[in-house]
């Protein structure tokens, strides 16, 4: 019930958005009186696409109806009488609505609960700046709702005026028929005698003159009514067009932009419910006005009166048709975009939705939607209305889907769940452009009939640009193309034009957004991190971020040309950082344990005055996705050391925390945090007992130059091998199998190569699994392989 309590505290626009969620499909009173029961049911456990879950959905429907009936029976007193009737009515209504489609009830309640939670979360997480933004947004939404109220009133006014015009015209026609009857009576006067004819003729003439004068005046009045009504419709359509522009060209375009940025890791684009409610109100008012205009045209045809009205009505009729055409074609949107990096022969999904499908009764004749993949050039031709019918650049399997109307949520949508790109036809590439820079788009098209087939619309919508790959190795460069396009695409562009150069601060914003999303962290890129990246990209030594604000970055600098002195591009290096953090080091990054964006010289400057054993973790310059340890330790040869970088492959063998735990001479995480305080919760527990007489070997990180230091600092800490009570463990002299490896594992810069020690480790593991009797006791043990410390080398 806590969710409903929080939802009731929503204010302003958030409260209005919550109210939109409810209606006849699920009354808000049911949510209120059954809040605790509703929130305790397993709505999310039901798979809406699995027919076998229908029985569970039916049980939930029956439970809901029973709870409502019980709640109704418990109502007593004068105030409870009306509530008892109302709750009983709701129980019957829900039973009748969902009896044949219980899955729709589940879909409806899940939709409501999800959006309630989202609104509460957004309200709770809003900062002061976000509050200002929400206030501005609420003000804008308030203005939209006020305009709808104004449109409702003027539409009601023209409806009243139309009825008055119709009544006036009907009375005019009656009087006109009376005039014709008088004229017929004049023809009959010839049959009367002269005296009687003269008497009757005088009376008829007076009546005719009076009636003709009235008809003339009334015809002018009718014409005036018609002109005034047409003018009112013109003003209504001006207001309608203005409101539609705000909703379609501002609000809907902003939603699409948020959807595009969400592809780069930006905040979710948000629900379409408010937009749909606005579009449905537009559709309703537009249709009411269209019907009024058609009735006015019928009245004019019924009683033609020369004047400007026919031309005015033709104009407003054409205008209202344009407005409704724009509404229908613009509200056919892609709710769930296909993946923007699209691999051939791989299943993918997408969802399209018509925001006005319910109000315009499009669902009465469910339309079919077809998806095809087209090239950038074909997309340009399509928007120019050039003849590109049936042209495509590949073959998509399962590319047709019928739109379904979900009564509970009022949505008309088509869910493509099992599409697959079978093949792709590429265009001739330009200059240095690679296949991962070539953009395609998925075209969704359909045909909608509106108003009993009065109007038929051919609708099309294009997905965000997609890059097609055939191998996973192309994914990183394809992602760079998508990132650049999503970040820097301008509204209303020609497909898929994007600036070749952007300012460094613009790129910083895009990189930070992507970084936080990929690493799934609120700890984004700091000012110091961005300075480091700028130095790397521009090959500069300036340490002031402001010095880079006016500098431009080209696409070639970003991911076509290698960085000076290296065999990789800027994006490839940055993407490698995100990859290793995402796969192995999210908690360490969030803990602030990884400094990361510092070079070797900066690490030297940071550590030089620190106590021995102080270390930091930084991203390697020489190895994409590599992390190296730099530490302070005075020796006759040097006082700063750098371990050869670890990569994703290394961390899949032994975690970073365990490797650091093995190196006992690493004591403080820069600047002065005890290592175990930071990393001990991530150490792999050491098992003390053998299983079935066998002990499980472990790999241990060892740096030969520091074996003595490690042993001294480890003191008397027992290893797993020492602690194991298994009888299979023989005295240490029995492990004299290999002489010490004479090759150093620290390079001339003090970097340790893990690969050169891993072969030894694997060989030892193999020997540990052999029977003890087969071991040769004559060989001396390799120095440092079985030193006391955390874990054992296997």
UniProtKB/Swiss-Prot annotation:
Gene: STAT5A
Keyword Cytoplasm part of the UniProt annotation: yes
Top-level taxonomy: Eukaryota, Metazoa, Chordata, Craniata, Vertebrata
Function: Carries out a dual function: signal transduction and activation of transcription. Mediates cellular responses to the cytokine KITLG/SCF and other growth factors. May mediate cellular responses to activated FGFR1, FGFR2, FGFR3 and FGFR4. Binds to the GAS element and activates PRL-induced transcription. Regulates the expression of milk proteins during lactation.
GO CC terms, sorted: cytoplasm; cytosol; nucleus; RNA polymerase II transcription regulator complex
Sorted UniProt keywords: Activator, Cytoplasm, DNA-binding, Lactation, Nucleus, Phosphoprotein, SH2 domain, Transcription, Transcription regulation, Ubl conjugation
Database matches in SUPFAM superfamilies: p53-like transcription factors, SH2 domain, STAT, Transcription factor STAT-4 N-domain
Cell location: Cytoplasm; Nucleus
Name the UniProt record assigns to this protein: Signal transducer and activator of transcription 5A
GO annotation terms (biological process): cell surface receptor signaling pathway via JAK-STAT; cytokine-mediated signaling pathway; defense response; development of secondary female sexual characteristics; female pregnancy; growth hormone receptor signaling pathway via JAK-STAT; lactation; lipid storage
Family stated for the protein in its record: Belongs to the transcription factor STAT family.
Assembly with partners or alone: Forms a homodimer or a heterodimer with a related family member. Binds NR3C1. Interacts with NCOA1 and SOCS7. Interacts with ERBB4. Interacts with EBF4. Interacts with CD69.
Entry PTM: ISGylated. Tyrosine phosphorylated in response to KITLG/SCF, IL2, IL3, IL7, IL15, CSF2/GMCSF, GH1, PRL, EPO and THPO. Activated KIT promotes phosphorylation on tyrosine residues and subsequent translocation to the nucleus. Tyrosine phosphorylated in response to constitutively activated FGFR1, FGFR2, FGFR3 and FGFR4. Tyrosine phosphorylation is required for DNA-binding activity and dimerization. Serine phosphorylation is also required for maximal transcriptional activity.
Gene Ontology molecular function: DNA binding; DNA-binding transcription factor activity, RNA polymerase II-specific; RNA polymerase II cis-regulatory region sequence-specific DNA binding
Organism: Bos taurus
CDD domains assigned to the protein according to its UniProt record, in alphabetical order: SH2_STAT5a, STAT5_CCD, STAT5_DBD
Residues bearing the modification Phosphotyrosine: 90, 682, 694
Modified residues (Phosphoserine): 128
Region feature (Disordered): 771-794
Span of domain SH2: 589-686
